[in-house]
Swiss-Prot record:
It comes from the Eukaryota. PANTHER family: NOTCHLESS PROTEIN HOMOLOG 1, WD40 REPEAT PROTEIN. It comes from Saccharomyces cerevisiae (strain ATCC 204508 / S288c) (Baker's yeast). This is Ribosome assembly protein 4. The lineage of its organism: Eukaryota, Fungi, Dikarya, Ascomycota, Saccharomycotina. WD repeats lie at residues 141-181, 184-223, 227-273, 276-314, 352-396, 400-439, 442-481, 484-515. Residues 29-125 are annotated as: Ubiquitin-like (UBL) domain.
């Protein structure tokens, strides 16, 4: 069913007034001198230009496209400016142009109207994702609630789902039919994950085991991986660029039993068991610099060094309740590995490693530093932004949600963070400093998950209210309402090539959405 937006509360009305106060621009604001410089190469475009002091981000984008001769097929850009502190020892700050030049640089005092401002630009993406607008199919097959879903890292033609009927299923999204039913688990399939080379699917179950599958044949690759004493809560693959030559990516699993295990997927042996958490581990992520991050119901996040046999090197303590989820600023690069939006496959393992490392470093560079940032979401209604390689203290405490935060995700370029909460709202935050940007309202029940489009301009959410909604990050508004499911929607994913969105939930139907 289509949902009606509820009337705004007093708090929402107050929040809505804040952006208006920021947007007041002096009438006598003079023109300023700017120049465009490519962030990656340092090349200047067009020399010095005089522009209005209140020029908006969109107008800057139009101007740059004119200078580059791409007005007919405009490229979306992000703009930032580096600010040196008053003392030589002060760190250099990177300020994003998020609204207009005046509110981002001049009003806060970073620049005056007499300065020449160098704007560093970088393309948001090399392609444009269209918002999905319709359900292309509703496919039956699962006999119980669908709990998890994931597109392949290299194509939108293949997708896997896990359900409460003890099976996972691989779907052919081109013909919109089921390909293989993955039978072997004896209880609910709680998590599914594609290896970053697209050659193996891992499933984790409430039967305490993990199984590996061949996505082409649907056959189980050997026996189940056994060792956990309680159910599997999440899975994470070793990034391609860290895999030793001649080896296959290893797999990390987290469990309700409070441990994390590292599995050799060829010999099927558990290499390390990492103990230390005193309660269920809700989420595990394998980072791009040889570290593993885990969030737990013991209210802590732990950082583990895989190169030192899984030794715990940091414990991050700030949350006052369960840690439900965590996301890395490099998640997208780690997911796609050596692929890109075209799905072109490298010809050799060496080429794959090189391309995967390029993808990873490109994301780090876009984010303004070479380190992975991490955001954690909790039952305490808050999130924390961390630089786990530098400090055990958070960069920012992110507050605003009125109920538990269930899901959190960095945008593919690491510039934004989006959070989904049981307070029916989605919030957008700055990925560098954790500052609040906007609230997306429209769902009338708990929001379970969010997924980004690869070009960072759109996101899709799924909710208890039976709908999916597509949001425009630039306008901060609802783009498309997607009714269709007959009950709660628990899982959503957006394919890397941007062509499709998949969803599943309590009505047992897999839905594919396209434009």
């Amino acid at each position: 069913m289509s949902t009606l937006i509820p009337p705004p509360s007093k708090k929402q009305k107050k929040e809505a007034q804040l952006p208006r106060e920021v947007a007041i621009i002096p009438k006598d604001l003079p023109n300023v001198s700017i120049k465009f410089q490519a962030l990656d190469t340092g090349d200047n475009v067009g020399g010095a230009l005089r522009v209005p002091g209140a020029i908006s981000e969109k107008q800057l984008e139009e101007l740059l496209n004119q200078l580059n001769g791409t007005s007919d097929d405009p490229v979306p850009y992000t703009f930032s400016c580096t600010i040196q502190g008053k003392k030589a020892s002060d760190p250099v700050k990177t300020i994003d142009i998020t609204d207009n030049l005046y509110s981002s640089l001049i009003k806060p005092g970073y620049n005056s109207t007499e300065d020449q401002i160098t704007l560093l630009y970088t393309p948001r993406a090399v392609f444009k994702v269209k918002p999905v607008t319709r359900s292309s199919s509703a496919i039956a097959g699962h006999g119980s609630t669908i709990l998890c879903s994931a597109f392949a890292p290299h194509t939108s033609s293949r997708m896997v789902t896990g359900a409460g009927d003890n099976t996972a299923r691989i779907w052919d999204c081109d013909t919109q039919t089921p390909m293989h039913t993955l039978k072997g688990h004896y209880n609910w399939v709680l998590c599914v994950s594609w290896s970053p080379d697209g050659e193996v699917i891992a499933t984790g179950s409430m039967d305490n085991t993990i199984r590996l599958w061949d996505p082409k044949s649907g056959q189980c690759l050997g026996d189940a991986l056994r060792g956990h004493s309680k159910w599997i809560t999440s899975l994470s693959w070793e990034p391609i660029h860290l895999v030793k030559p001649g080896s296959k990516p290893r797999l990390a699993s987290s469990s309700k039993d409070g441990t994390i295990k590292i599995w050799d997927t060829v010999s099927r042996v558990c290499q390390y068991t990492m103990s230390g958490h005193t309660n269920s581990v809700s989420c595990v992520k394998w980072g791009g610099q040889g570290l593993l991050y885990s969030g737990s119901h013991d209210r802590t996040v732990r950082v583990w060094d895989i190169n030192s046999q899984g030794r715990c090197i940091n414990i991050l303590k700030s949350h006052a309740h369960w840690v439900n989820h965590l996301s890395l600023s490099t998640d997208y690069a780690l997911r796609i590995g050596a692929f890109d939006h075209t799905g072109k496959k490298p010809s050799t393992p060496e080429e794959a490693q090189k391309k995967a490392l390029e993808n990873y470093e490109k994301i780090c560079k876009k984010n303004g530093n070479s380190e992975e940032m991490m955001v954690t979401a909790s039952d305490d209604y808050t999130m924390f932004l961390w630089n786990p390689l530098k400090s055990t203290k958070p960069i920012a405490r992110m507050t605003g949600h009125q109920k538990l935060v269930n899901h959190v995700a960095f945008s593919p370029d690491g510039r934004y963070i989006v959070s989904a909460s049981f307070d029916n709202s989605i919030k957008l935050w700055d990925g560098r400093d954790g500052k609040f940007i906007s609230t997306f309202r429209g769902h009338v029940a708990s929001v379970y998950q969010v997924a980004w489009s690869s070009d960072c301009r759109l996101l899709v959410s799924c909710s208890k209210d039976t709908t999916l909604k597509v949001w425009d990050v630039r306008t901060r508004k609802l783009s498309v309402d997607l009714p269709g499911h007959k009950d709660e929607v628990y899982t959503v994913d957006w394919s890397v090539d941007g062509k499709r969105v998949c969803s599943g939930g309590k009505d047992k139907m897999v839905r594919l959405w396209t434009h």
